[in-house]
C-alpha cells in the first residue's frame, strides 16, 4: 500500500527535496528576507500613517528560536498542502499552469475562512499571497522559497510586531499592538 502511494506521488515528494534546482540555501534565504520585507513594509507604512501603535515588549532568545521553528513548521505544513501537493497535482494534470497557480491559491484562501475576524479583504489578501507563493514555485522551482516567505511573513507580523496573524494573537511577541488605537487602512486591516 505505502509503496503504491509513494510511487504515484514521487514527483510531489521530490518537489520538497533538493532535486528541484530552486530548492537551495540561496532561495531559502531570499524567501526569509522577502517575507520580512513585504510584511515589514506594510507594517512600516501603517505605523508611519498612525494606523497602528506598537510598543516594545521583550525579547527572550530561547523563546525567539523556539517560536521561529514552530512558525516554520506551521507555515511549511500549509505550503506542503497547497504548493507541495495540490499545486504539483494540478500542474501535472493540466497543461495550463494558471490552473495550478489559481487553483491552489483558492484552496489556500478557503483554508483561512475560519480565521478569527475574517473579512473579504483578508481573504482577498490571502488569495493574492497564495498566487505569489505559487508563482515562486512556478518560476523559481523552489518550494523552499515559498516555505521561507510564508514563515517570515507570519513571524514578522505575529512575533516581531505583535499583530494578529490569521486572527490569532500570541502570548509571546517582541512588540505589542495597542489594539484600541488600531484602525483599518490600505496598509493594515484591523479585522
Model feature map: region roles:
Residues 49-57, 111-120:
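Membrane-interface helix caps and helix-loop-helix hairpins in membrane proteins
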Residues 77-103, 135-142:
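Membrane-interface helix/loop boundary segments of multi-pass membrane proteins
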Residues 122-186:
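Functionally important transmembrane alpha-helices
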Residues 28-33, 64-65, 73-75, 98-103, 123-127, 180-191, ...:
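Hydrophobic alpha-helical transmembrane segments
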Residues 40, 97-113, 127-130:
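Small-polar-interrupted transmembrane alpha-helices in polytopic inner-membrane proteins
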Residues 12-77, 87-88, 92:
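Juxtamembrane helix-loop-helix connectors linking adjacent transmembrane helices
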